Curated annotation (Swiss-Prot):
The lineage of its organism: Archaea, Methanobacteriati, Methanobacteriota, Methanomada group, Methanopyri. The keyword NAD applies. Transmembrane segments: none annotated. Keywords: ATP-binding, Ligase, Magnesium, Metal-binding, NAD, Nucleotide-binding. It catalyses: deamido-NAD(+) + NH4(+) + ATP = AMP + diphosphate + NAD(+) + H(+). It holds the Pfam family NAD_synthase. This is NH(3)-dependent NAD(+) synthetase. It comes from Methanopyrus kandleri (strain AV19 / DSM 6324 / JCM 9639 / NBRC 100938).
């Protein structure tokens, strides 16, 4: 059984139909771009493993390359899980340690004389990884697949020009709990789907839910009520209560603040004398 599942009927998903739809979408985008090879950064987590499985479903395992990019503080189990996922789906994969690249930047977690900064040091890791992914994509004349989900997209829980950078985003429309349903259907390794605590591994001991301050099932339900249904915090809480989901108005306010405060991350960079682009999450 998956670690998380949607808790409101509006978020229930037909995995077989969804996989077919995403695979068709991916094939279309690669055909438009005139490319054949997909490059996927594989962390050992559910999002990247699911993205890998979808790429194989769409393009065939011979056209998918996985890159596993640990650094000094990456738990060994993450590398093992990533390798297991790559082997489960039968794709070519490479493991490259990025520790020395991070050290060359003089980040605080690697250079004792520099204080560690959660914002700059932690965000450097996904940005370095994205550089490596695009290097390989250029070498292979391929496209980089993003591994971010809708929950991360709406809350801004991603690094600009890091894990937020990609050529195609096949699971950006799926909430985190929906990703687990798809992962289970695709055959992502059981430990990743059933047991593993979601974490961006930005620093030792970091977890997604600890940083966000709310569990994923409740967060997804609140996001759906606030964004997709367009309800205010009080009405969102009442609406969820009718569906058996307990949440507080304080929770709803906090989630809405995450959406609003991260809107700049979802818009293209503004330019002088250009219309201010709308936040895709808050329009329509």
């Amino acid at each position: 059984m998956a670690k998380y599942e949607p808790v409101i009927p509006e978020l229930e998903v037909n995995p077989e139909g969804e996989v077919s739809k995403i695979a068709e979408f991916l094939r279309g985008k690669f055909e438009e771009a005139g490319r054949e090879i997909a490059v996927v950064g594989l962390s050992g987590g559910v999002d990247s493993s699911t993205t890998l499985g979808l790429a194989v479903e769409a393009l065939g395992r011979e056209n998918v390359v996985a890159l596993i990019l640990p650094e000094r503080d990456t738990p060994e189990e993450d590398v093992e899980d990533a390798v297991e996922a790559a082997e489960r789906f039968g794709v070519e994969y490479h493991v490259h340690d990025i520790t020395e690249v991070l050290r060359a930047f003089g980040t605080g977690s690697y250079v004792p004389c520099h204080p560690f900064s959660r914002k700059s040091d932690a965000n450097l890791k996904p940005r370095v990884r994205m550089c490596v992914l695009y290097y390989f994509a250029n070498e292979l004349d391929g496209l980089v697949l993003g591994t971010g989900n809708r929950t991360e997209w709406l809350t801004g829980y991603f690094t600009l020009h890091g894990d937020g950078a990609c050529d195609v985003a096949p699971i950006r429309h799926l909430y985190k709990t929906q990703v687990y349903v798809i992962a289970e259907h695709l055959g992502v390794p059981e430990r990743i789907v059933e047991e593993k605590e979601p974490s961006a591994r930005l620093w030792p001991g970091q977890t997604d839910e600890g940083e966000l301050g709310i569990d994923y099932p409740t967060l997804d339900a609140l996001l759906y009520a606030l964004v997709d249904e367009g309800l205010g915090p009080r009405k969102a809480v009442d609406w969820l209560g009718e569906r058996g989901v307990e949440a507080t108005e304080e929770d709803a306010e906090k989630v809405l603040d995450l959406v609003r405060s991260s809107s700049f991350k979802r818009r293209p960079a503004p330019g002088l004398d250009l219309p201010e682009p709308e936040d895709p999450a808050m329009s329509g």
